From Swiss-Prot:
Keywords: DNA damage, DNA repair, DNA-binding, Glycosidase, Hydrolase, Lyase, Metal-binding, Multifunctional enzyme, Zinc, Zinc-finger
Oligomer and partners: Monomer.
Enzyme Commission number(s) of this protein: 3.2.2.23, 4.2.99.18
Cofactor section: Zn(2+)
Protein name, UniProt field: Formamidopyrimidine-DNA glycosylase
Cofactor note: Binds 1 zinc ion per subunit.
Task performed by this protein: Involved in base excision repair of DNA damaged by oxidation or by mutagenic agents. Acts as a DNA glycosylase that recognizes and removes damaged bases. Has a preference for oxidized purines, such as 7,8-dihydro-8-oxoguanine (8-oxoG). Has AP (apurinic/apyrimidinic) lyase activity and introduces nicks in the DNA strand. Cleaves the DNA backbone by beta-delta elimination to generate a single-strand break at the site of the removed base with both 3'- and 5'-phosphates.
UniProt GO BP: base-excision repair
Molecular function terms, GO-annotated: 8-oxo-7,8-dihydroguanine DNA N-glycosylase activity; class I DNA-(apurinic or apyrimidinic site) endonuclease activity; damaged DNA binding; zinc ion binding
Species this protein is from: Acidiphilium cryptum (strain JF-5)
Length: 275
């Protein structure tokens, strides 16, 4: 599933193409994705001007001049295309007044499209329970330590809980925990202010670096332009089981990156440097 950096990258690509443009033609190929698409969806979008975009966690809002926003969720395999020939499983096509063509392609149909009043975006059922944005100033060591206090789950599982912090997924949690030197299996309630003081900057730096690289291309994800993301080339632990840890002096000190499974998801870490 695309995580925060991939969604941010997609949103920026769409904003560059769509902001200020009118939607001259809207084609919806099916009435539902993961959930039913609202009746009148095409009519509400047709002729509307795109005023801007906003990301919340792994969700995007395309804001229209009708006090309405289109919620877009890429799900597991969804992607947006710009000026591409129609693709299989392209469920939504937007054509602008200057001739740009935007497509929403989702082979597995775990994505979502919905309409919400712009003023009520944060009240949408998919948004209301989300935790803070990790790149906002309000996400601090103090707020994270408070959210984790008393939790008996491993820190990795806690960070994947979207009510604790929004937008993180398996890749970036693994990478941030490595940067912070924190073992993924450590109980979340033992993090405290001290370790949170390392973890919060590590999360922010990991996400910032990933956005700058256009995200991580893994299976289905590409940028709207069709380009791959490049952050997968900078992974320190994710999908690197058995490979050397860059922080360790060599095989005599470290067996390399370890892999375990937590809650059905692969976890990667260095047992020597993460505690």
């Amino acid at each position: 599933m695309p995580e925060l950096p991939e969604v941010e990258t997609v949103m920026r690509g769409l904003a560059a193409k769509l902001e200020g443009r009118r939607l001259a033609r809207v084609v919806l190929a099916r009435p539902d994705l993961r959930w039913p698409i609202p009746e009148g969806f095409v009519q509400f979008l047709s002729g509307a001007r795109v005023e801007g975009f906003r990301r919340r966690g792994k969700y995007m809002f395309m804001r229209l001049d009708r006090a309405l926003s289109v919620l877009i969720h890429l799900g597991m395999s969804g992607r947006m295309t710009i000026d591409s020939a129609p693709l299989p499983h392209q469920h939504l096509t937007l054509e602008t007044d200057d001739g740009a063509v935007i497509g929403f392609v989702d082979p597995r149909r775990f994505g979502a499209l919905d309409l919400v009043a712009t003023a009520a975006e944060d009240s949408h059922r998919l948004i209301a329970g989300l935790g803070p944005e990790p790149l906002d100033d309000a996400f601090s060591p103090a707020t994270l330590a408070s959210a984790l206090e008393g939790k008996k789950t491993p820190i990795k599982a806690a960070l994947l809980d979207q009510s604790v912090v929004a937008g993180l997924g398996n890749i970036y949690v693994s990478e941030a925990l490595f940067r912070a030197g924190i073992l993924p299996h450590r109980l979340a309630g033992t993090i405290g202010r001290g370790r949170a003081g390392r973890l919060v900057p590590a999360i922010k730096a990991t996400l910032t670096d990933a956005i700058a690289a256009g995200g991580s291309s893994l299976r289905d994800y590409v940028q709207p332009s069709g380009e791959l993301g490049y952050f997968q080339h900078a992974w320190k632990v994710y999908d690197r089981a058995g490979q050397p840890c860059e922080r360790c002096p060599g095989p005599a000190a470290c067996a390399g990156i370890s892999r375990t499974v937590q809650s059905g998801r692969a976890t990667y870490f260095c047992a020597r440097t993460q505690k």
